[in-house]
Curated annotation (Swiss-Prot):
GO molecular function, one term: ATP binding
Residue(s) at site: Transition state stabilizer: 220
Enzymatic class: transferase
Similarity comment text for this entry: Belongs to the pyruvate kinase family. In the C-terminal section; belongs to the PEP-utilizing enzyme family.
Binding annotation for Mg(2+): 222, 246
Protein's UniProt name: Pyruvate kinase
Cofactors required: Mg(2+); K(+)
Keyword set, alphabetical order: ATP-binding, Glycolysis, Kinase, Magnesium, Metal-binding, Nucleotide-binding, Potassium, Pyruvate, Transferase
Family annotation (InterPro entries): PEP-util_enz_mobile_dom, Phosphohistidine_dom_sf, Pyr_Knase, Pyrv/PenolPyrv_kinase-like_dom, Pyrv_kinase-like_dom_sf, Pyrv_Knase-like_insert_dom_sf, Pyrv_Knase_brl, Pyrv_Knase_C
Short name of one Pfam family: PK_C
Record: residues binding substrate: 32, 245-246, 278
Species annotation: Staphylococcus haemolyticus (strain JCSC1435)
Pathway where it operates: Carbohydrate degradation; glycolysis; pyruvate from D-glyceraldehyde 3-phosphate: step 5/5
Enzyme Commission number, as recorded: 2.7.1.40
Length: 586
């Protein structure tokens, strides 16, 4: 099972039912809606279509609302475009004017108070660079030298690298969009241009005022101020998005990979999901194949420890949205297969802080690795159990069984977690039985698989992960007292006397008999296992089992009547249990 999650931006190229179905089948886990573009009516139509297709396919798909944020843009230019020439001067006005090569204006009136002589102003993702030469606060004008030639069109982005700006945490539009998201029951908010913890708390205040406790907040770190305040920002956040687009304009491009690794590591330490975004497969907007550099970029983000990787224009407006998702999926699967999970677990154990809940998580991960369990089944109300285990990046699949649709969609973004919605768990026994049955229903585990079940007891309390149980999936058909510690798989041969075994090939057989006498010994020596009804560790059955090092179970009531000839069984002498079929016992 692929463990790294894929976020796809939904736009004109991907909003149809047909294409959404293709993206979901290709590997999309979360649908991102960019509120920098489009009306509420357009986004509602997309949300409805996403949920309709997901329900039809039986998929759990999260929905992420990406705010426009408090960005700075230019106003309109004369004839829609002006040319700025290197070596000349241009005035940036705080009052709205029609842009000319001599003067244009910006949407942020306090820019004049934030910059100083020598500050840089970058236009249109850094394609045009200005340097502040003089500031005239009386006129509300900033005179700049033009450092390189370039075109400037209407409403282009403005970046102020290294400058602390006094923009609000969220705009009126953002607040309106968030209220819309609450009404439409979105799962996550990606908050654009977050600079300080108060920016996140402004959003949290809206959610709390609306009594919403389901939506999680992922600040987008896109500037130096956000990088500098990352520790405090993470304290009030549920996760993080490493938004490399504007970040690569605000800080030197060569610093972006270093910052990316640092931000991901900080999230990993706290066990908070992190998304790596922007230009991951950018060339696939135009071409059906990714470049080698892009493949390396996606893989290295996974090696860095990201929970999810994101596609932007590739799926929103590109020519090959389905191919982009498939490519990202294949890169993720390949990168995960090359991971050294033993080393990964060791590194995570050292990185993540010790706590009672984390102690269970790390124990689950170590046990899963040492015993090579097929899956970890996390029974969870809030999702915290699955998140706790995910911190340690276990090789085994994490099947998160939850009664909550909201929790399932939240887990769509968590590394390694496969959420399954299942109602009805009132007692601990119900919880365990329900978890096992649900895991089998997914097809990811089958009879004979060794799994770990983990949960919080009592049920329903967030952050109380405190239970771990090893469980063998399958039907236990009989039990008694085991002799020795081995296990074996074979077909039963029921024998009431030695004559029943004459001429029978016993090389892969388990003999089932009432008791053992000397006439049976030559046949028992040929068999792989022994099951008898007689009791006692000093009985002939126990003695012959020990002497011949044959996995033996004694004291199995009515064995010769209950166990039929020719059925495949697993004899587990360590537990004194007999399972139908093959069971992966220790």
């Amino acid at each position: 099972m692929r463990k790294t999650k894929i976020v796809c931006t939904i736009g004109p190229a991907s909003e149809s039912e047909e294409m959404l179905e293709k993206l979901m089948k290709a590997g999309m886990n979360v649908a991102r809606l960019n509120f920098s573009h489009g009306s509420h009516e357009e986004h509602k139509a997309r949300i409805d279509t996403i949920r309709k297709v997901a329900d039809r396919l039986g998929k759990t798909i999260g929905i992420l609302l990406d705010t426009k944020g408090p960005e700075i843009r230019t106003h309109d230019m004369k004839d829609g475009l002006i040319m700025l020439e290197k070596g000349k001067e241009v005035i940036v006005s705080m009052s709205q004017v029609e842009g000319t090569p001599e003067k244009f204006s910006v949407t942020y009136e306090d820019l004049i108070n934030d910059v100083q002589v020598g500050s840089y102003i970058l236009l249109d993702d850094g394609l045009v660079e200005l340097q502040v030469k003089d500031i005239d606060k009386t006129k509300g004008e900033v005179k700049c030298d033009i450092l390189n030639t370039g075109e400037l069109k209407n409403k282009k982005g403005v970046n102020l690298p290294g400058v602390k700006v006094n923009l609000p945490g969220i705009t009126d539009k953002d607040a309106d969009d968030i209220l819309f998201g609450i009404k439409e029951d979105v799962d996550y908010i990606a908050a654009s241009f977050v600079r300080r913890p108060s920016d996140v708390l402004d959003i949290r205040e809206i959610l709390e005022r609306e009594n919403n406790h389901n939506i999680t907040i992922f600040p987008k770190i896109e500037n130096q101020e956000g990088i500098d305040n990352i520790e405090e920002i993470l304290e009030v956040s549920d996760g993080l998005m490493v938004a490399r687009g504007d970040m690569g304009v605000e800080i030197p491009p060569e610093s972006v990979p270093i910052v990316q690794k640092d931000l991901i590591r900080k999230c990993n330490k706290l066990g908070k999901p992190v998304i790596t975004a922007t230009q991951m497969l950018d060339s696939m907007q135009r071409n059906p194949r990714a470049t080698r550099a892009e493949a390396s970029d996606v893989a290295n983000a996974i090696y860095d420890g990201t929970d999810a990787v994101m596609l932007s224009g590739e799926t929103a407006a590109g020519l090959y949205p389905e191919e982009a998702v498939k490519t990202m999926r294949n890169i993720a699967v390949s990168a995960e297969a090359a991971q050294d999970y033993k080393k990964l677990l060791s590194d995570r154990t050292k990185l993540v802080e010790t706590s009672l809940v984390n102690a269970i998580g790390v124990s689950v991960a170590h046990t899963a690795l040492n015993l090579n369990v097929k899956a970890i089944v996390a029974a969870t109300e809030s999702g915290s159990t699955a998140v706790t285990i995910s911190k340690y990046r276990p090789h085994s699949d994490i099947i998160a069984v939850t009664p909550s649709e909201h929790t399932a969609r939240q887990l769509a973004l968590v590394w390694g977690a496969y959420p399954v919605i299942k109602k009805g768990r009132k007692t601990t026994d119900d919880l365990l039985n329900n978890a096992v049955a649900t895991a089998v229903e997914t097809g990811r585990v089958t009879n004979g698989d060794l799994i770990i079940i983990t949960a919080g007891v009592p049920t329903g309390e967030k952050g109380t992960t405190n239970m771990m149980k090893l469980h063998l999936v399958g039907d236990e058909i009989a039990k008694g007292q085991g002799v020795g510690r081995g296990s074996v798989v074979g077909k039963t041969v029921v024998a009431n006397s030695a004559s029943d075994l004459e001429g029978v090939d016993l090389s892969e057989s388990v003999i089932v008999t009432n008791s053992v006498d000397e006439t049976l010994v030559p046949y028992i020596e040929q068999a792989v296992g022994l099951i008898t009804e007689e009791n006692g560790i000093t009985s002939p059955s126990a003695i012959i089992g020990l002497e011949k090092s044959i996995p033996t179970i004694i004291g199995v009531e009515n064995a010769t009547k209950e166990l039929k000839d020719g059925i495949l069984v697993t004899v587990d002498a360590a537990q004194g249990k007999i399972f139908e079929g093959y069971a992966n016992v220790l």
